[in-house]
Amino acid sequence: MNTLYYSFMMSFLKENHPEILKSIDKIYEPDLSKISKVIDCYCKFAGIPIQQIVGEYINYSDIQHRYKAIAVVLRIFQPEKFTNLKTKVKSTIYKELGPCLKINNDILQKSIICACNQFDLYRDFKMEIKQIANYYLIDARFNKDY
């Protein structure tokens, strides 16, 4: 699904069927084995290769992509984390996300804190994360590749 088509579809839903978007916002994915697919979906949506956000040392300009990818994962697998920042991230998310991004738990924990803070502070960041999460959920629902 290309992003232009997706944006038209989202505009149509927002204008004509806002209740559908509200119900999508309440969906979360219980299968944590799909975390790598969410990361792949984020990279596809952002138009970047996954190697850009993987590894201990990445370019400073790519760090925002890592934070956004982590925020999308949290939005899909543990959305309550964004309503209460004191909620602990599920240990199974750490176990899946760390190897997927090829980073240790310390860097992952700091990245999660940064992603949550940006989600809390910046409206544009929050809107983009919700948009990408909705893109994944819709794409996963209609394309059984995910």
Specify the residue positions occupied by each region the protein language model found.
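Residue-level detector of well-ordered alpha-helical segments, enriched
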Residues: K34, V38, R66-A69, I107
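Short Lys/Arg-enriched helix C-cap and helix-to-coil transition segments
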Residues: N117-R141
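General nucleic-acid-binding
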Residues: M1-Q51
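Short acidic DE-rich linear segments
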Residues: T3, L137-Y146
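Short, basic interhelical loop/turn and adjoining N-cap
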Residues: I93-S111
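Basic amphipathic recognition helices
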Residues: Q51-K95
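Short, solvent-exposed secondary-structure capping/transition elements
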Residues: P79-T87, L108-Q109, Q118-F125
